[in-house]
Regions:
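Intrinsic-disorder/low-complexity accessory segments
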Residues: 25-147, 151-176, 224, 230, ...
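Positively charged n-region of N-terminal signal peptides that target proteins for export
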Residues: 1-5
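Bacterial N-terminal signal peptides
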Residues: 8-19
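Aromatic- and acidic-residue-enriched carbohydrate-binding clefts of CAZyme catalytic domains
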Residues: 206-226
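Aromatic- and acidic-residue-enriched segments that line the glycan-binding/catalytic groove
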Residues: 191-205
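Active-site metal-binding loops of divalent metal-dependent hydrolases
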Residues: 142, 183, 260
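Short, conserved secondary-structure transition motifs
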Residues: 172-191
Length: 446
């Protein structure tokens, strides 16, 4: 009988220690602590994304309706946030625009915007004042297949609403942070539907898994196959017209664009290839980018995460999210995470997870906002001097205006004028006939 009692005692002790060890492991894993800065207190009234979703971020993609419900929930609980629907996709999904700043700034947000825009109007002679906030724009999910960007908007909004302490108070007092979630709702919904259809609670990181065998080009675009990251100039789609209208209303100092790239890469953010910069982009822009991303570099270094600059991506095409701001008095910063494609994926560089990409995009979002605040005066002065210089060069240029017409094609003329007006380019109807290059442009028709 004694051996039986000893064995029973050992089994009991083993069960106890196993239970204790399991309990310790469960207590040690806190998804919120893993995702968010641990040296910050948070407003307990505001639910974390994990609490709201009922699962850790990255365990499954966030559906569009979940994002909308969460952002509206958090906005209703925080006096730091305001949210509005700025448009709808072709499939009738709303595009949300969040303004995050201090309660004091929220109370005078229209005045802040008006004063900021005045920096881009040389005739108004607006100077940079000591209390003028820097404007940071964060956009997520323009390529729907690159889904971690959209999911990163949830912890970003949570942090801006719930984080407490002097550091975040200073950030919100000195900044207006504009979050557009999500740029491409229909493309993202397409991608999420595939992941939910072929994914499983038992994660399979094999690249040959059906979950990852997806043609990303389908969800990269919007409902009608338009690449919305080539729409910053042409603005023919309802999604791009919605967020570009807001961009022009604010003319941000810093615009950050979040993407995913090939799974065998690490993590990229600007500045890009130095020899591939459009000649219209001021040299000072590249130095400002390097200064603003310094906190993002510090975060990546602090966690021992790999990243790179100056390769693969350039600053040449001006019709995308990281290019257009560079010729409009601000800076554009591209971020690219190596895609997990599903929840997890085996690569030659190790296991890539969806959650890891969400974390990196979220933490660099906050870091970029902090970098913008650190460079507030330089960014605002650069914006003012950019438009002052452009106005001076235009005044000294031999060409004062361009004349155009589209005889017999009123629709073509209408859409061209609409495009110019959308980008705040002044257009006037000819008051008298003008002959140029052997062509006569009739008054009222050109």
């Amino acid at each position: 009988m004694r051996p039986i009692r000893i064995i029973g005692t050992l089994l009991t002790l083993a069960a106890f220690f196993l239970s204790a060890a399991t309990g310790a492991q469960e207590a040690a894993f806190d998804p919120d602590a893993e995702m968010f800065p641990v040296d910050v207190q948070y407003d307990a009234r505001i639910p974390t994304p994990e609490q709201f979703l009922g699962r850790p971020l990255g365990a499954a993609p966030v559906r569009h309706h979940e994002l909308v419900e969460y952002i509206n929930k958090v906005s209703g609980l925080s006096d730091r946030l305001s949210v509005e629907v700025i448009g709808y996709s072709h499939e009738r999904r709303p595009i949300l625009f969040v303004v995050a700043t201090s309660p004091a700034n929220q109370a005078r947000i229209d005045d802040i915007r008006t004063q900021h825009i005045a920096l881009t109007e040389p005739d108004l002679r607006q100077s940079v004042t000591a209390d003028m906030p820097v404007i940071t724009w964060l956009n997520y999910g323009v390529h729907g297949a690159e889904a971690s960007g959209m999911d990163a908007s949830l912890p970003t909004v949570y942090y801006l609403a719930a984080a407490q302490g002097a550091k975040v108070d200073q950030l919100l007092a000195g900044s207006v942070i504009l979050v557009t979630a999500v740029f491409n709702p229909d493309g993202h919904a397409n991608r999420v539907a595939w992941l939910d259809t072929y994914g499983s609670r038992v994660v399979n990181p094999d690249p040959n898994n059906m979950e990852q065998d997806y043609d990303g080009r389908v969800a990269r675009t919007n409902h009608y196959g338009f690449d919305l990251n080539r729409q910053w100039l042409s603005v023919t789609q309802p999604e791009s017209r919605a967020w570009m209208r807001k961009w022009h209303e604010w003319r941000p100092n810093v615009s950050v664009d979040y993407h995913e790239m090939g799974s065998e890469q690490t993590y990229y953010f600007a500045p890009g290839i130095p020899t591939r910069t459009h000649p219209l982009i001021p040299d000072e822009s590249m130095q400002l980018i390097a200064d603003v991303v310094a906190p993002a570099e510090q975060f990546m270094d602090s966690q021992g995460r790999l990243y790179f600059h100056g390769d693969r991506y350039d600053h040449f095409f001006l019709g995308k999210g990281a290019g257009f701001p560079l010729v409009n008095g601000g800076i554009g910063i591209l971020h690219e995470a190596s895609a997990a494609r599903g929840v997890a994926r085996k690569t030659s560089n190790g296991l890539r997870t969806y959650r890891e990409n969400i974390l990196k995009h979220f933490r660099t979002s906050i870091a970029n906002a902090e970098g913008a605040l650190q460079q507030r005066d330089a960014l605002l002065q650069f914006q003012k001097s950019f438009y002052d210089s452009a106005s001076e060069r235009a005044g000294n240029h031999s060409v004062k205006a361009y004349v155009f017409a589209a005889p017999g094609d009123d629709a073509r003329l209408y859409h061209f004028v609409d495009l110019l007006n959308f980008h705040r380019i002044e257009v006037r109807t000819l008051a008298q006939d003008v002959t140029e290059g052997g062509i006569t442009y009739r008054a009222g028709e050109a």
